[in-house]
């Protein structure tokens, strides 16, 4: 076994990883669940009475529902390059889809690098797609598996779970035998009200329902393993979508994303409102997320990060605007 792994194992065994930050406050676990391609219009708690998302809706009732969260890019890889670095893709040169240009990795590290410095176990199951060359996408993660046993070993964890059931690819295929009724949809004004469109809406509602069930499964597992009371849960999608005029397009349909954050009672000082179940109007840009996660964890927040901390004791002034952008993409 490598020496570093032996040393880490001893630290875990004797409980010596820093569960408390420098100011004496307890470090939270963070579970970040992401889905793909669904904008707010596919989620019940955001106002669609036909959406079947009971687990996400329940999470919103237990947490804080952000009403104005926007992706910086309306497609996955550029969007995720901003997530992993905290730097705008237009600054990095990662905006063109599938380009994977190198960046100066010595100056621009990935946010899990900073989490691991303060004792976090960092895992991603499993979507990276960072569109960055010169470094393996998996290099910053301790694991690409969901291993509840390791998450219970005493060190704080940052666990990413990506649910792909709502990805654009799930919107294709047979649309004549859906469980969701084509009559029970909220049709966008820019789509014609014809049977084919209604069937495609119903088909994607089925995909979102499956995604919601997976979110519910992971939240149940978190509870069953006795980790809920120490874990901040974040749910959001990676950009908008998925029917025509959404994904890849710089409209709200391509960028306006659900964001729900459940914060345990022990961290109530970080609540953005008086009580869970509140709707939060603050404007949040995806570029704000990595900087905020580092702040919540009590980790170093590098100056190169361009976002605003929107939650916790390090919260910064609300951003006056958000910017989205796109370039070449498939």
Model-derived features with residue positions:
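Formylglycine-dependent sulfatase
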Residues: 2-7, 20-330
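Bacterial N-terminal signal peptides
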Residues: 8-18
């Amino acid at each position: 076994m490598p020496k570093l792994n032996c040393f880490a194992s001893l630290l875990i065994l004797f409980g010596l990883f820093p569960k408390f930050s420098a100011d004496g406050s307890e470090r939270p676990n963070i579970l970040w669940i992401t889905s793909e391609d669904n904008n707010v219009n596919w989620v019940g708690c955001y106002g669609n009475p036909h959406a079947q998302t009971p687990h996400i809706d329940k999470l919103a009732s237990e947490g804080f529902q952000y009403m104005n969260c926007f992706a910086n890019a309306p497609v996955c890889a550029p969007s995720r390059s901003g997530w992993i670095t905290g730097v705008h893709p237009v600054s990095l040169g990662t905006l063109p889809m599938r380009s994977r240009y190198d960046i100066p990795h010595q100056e621009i590290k990935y946010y899990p690098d900073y989490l691991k410095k303060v004792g976090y176990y960092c895992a991603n199951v499993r979507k990276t797609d960072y569109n960055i060359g010169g470094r393996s996408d998996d290099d910053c993660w301790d694991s690409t598996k969901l291993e509840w046993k390791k998450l219970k070993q005493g060190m704080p964890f940052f666990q990413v779970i990506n649910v792909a059931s709502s990805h654009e690819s799930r919107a294709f295929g047979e649309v004549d035998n859906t469980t969701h009724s084509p009559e029970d949809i909220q049709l966008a004004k820019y789509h014609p009200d014809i049977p084919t469109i209604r069937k495609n809406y119903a088909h994607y509602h089925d995909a979102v329902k499956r995604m919601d069930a997976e979110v519910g499964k992971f939240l149940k597992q978190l509870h069953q393993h006795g980790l809920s009371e120490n874990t901040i849960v974040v749910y959001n999608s990676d950009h908008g979508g998925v029917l025509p005029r959404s994904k890849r397009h710089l409209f709200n349909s391509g960028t306006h994303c659900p964001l729900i954050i459940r914060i345990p009672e022990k961290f109530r000082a970080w609540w953005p409102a008086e009580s869970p179940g509140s709707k939060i109007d603050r404007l949040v840009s995806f570029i704000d997320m990595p900087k905020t996660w580092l702040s919540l964890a009590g980790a170093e927040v590098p100056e190169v990060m361009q976002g605003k901390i929107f939650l916790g004791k390090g919260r910064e002034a609300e951003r006056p605007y958000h910017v989205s952008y796109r370039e070449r993409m498939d």
